[in-house]
Amino acid sequence: MTCFARWDDLIDKSKDYNEILIMPTWRSWLDEAEDSTFLQSDYYKNYSELLHSERLNKLLEEYDLVFNFYIHPKFKDYISNFNVTSDRMRLIPYGEEPLNELMMRCKLLITDYSSVCWDVYYMNKPVLFYQFDYDLYNTIHGSYLDMEKDLFGYRSLTLDKLLDDFENACKNNFKQPREYEIMRDSKFAFTDRNNSARIVREIKKMKIFD
């Protein structure tokens, strides 16, 4: 096992920024849906509720945080349907800022089922999983992880639980919970930013170019 070459470029920059990143993945059943259909979806309703949460806004103020909402590229045309009521929240259209930069700057990631969780976890930052539509998503998409047993971050099915977990993370200065710090050693064979070199060595061993 070599780990991904792209992880060599990941540097934790969070000490210089007070940013939270939220990046949910897409839903195949909403792909290319009309705006009228999208606006009636649980996806839109739940993320809109989060963005308009008074409790969340108070936490952002209290801990001097900026909340970056970065929509999946397959849903980029829907971002105009979202709005925020706080200058501590930013709606970032796909491509406007490099995703890896947002991941490096964030103190914590909120996602649902997106594989970006691995990049953030690689940097040993806390991840919160917001899975309000888990039953439907699991039925249609399935998963390579057991979402009830194998996640490396606190899981919530409701907004209240998510905000409880987020508030606790704020109070703990976004320190990785001990249980997930220990788990990290079993998830990554290496965390030394030498993955590219290992990949090259393994390719040479295969003697593909002889």
Kindly give the residue locations of the regions a language model identified:
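Helix-loop-beta element that forms the nucleotide-linked donor phosphate-binding surface
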Residues: 1-3
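Structural alpha-helical scaffold elements that stabilize or flank donor/cofactor-binding regions
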Residues: 59, 101-102, 148
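Short, well-ordered alpha-helix to beta-strand connector turns
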Residues: 17, 105-106, 124
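Short, charged, surface-exposed secondary-structure boundary motifs
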Residues: 11-12, 99-104, 138-144
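Conserved catalytic-core segment of nucleotide-activated headgroup transferases in glycan assembly
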Residues: 5-81, 156, 191, 195
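Donor nucleotide-activated moiety binding/catalytic core segment of transferases
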Residues: 73-118
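C-terminal alpha-helical cap of glycosyltransferases
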Residues: 192-210
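Catalytic binding pocket for nucleotide-activated donors in carbohydrate/polymer assembly enzymes
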Residues: 82-84, 115-187
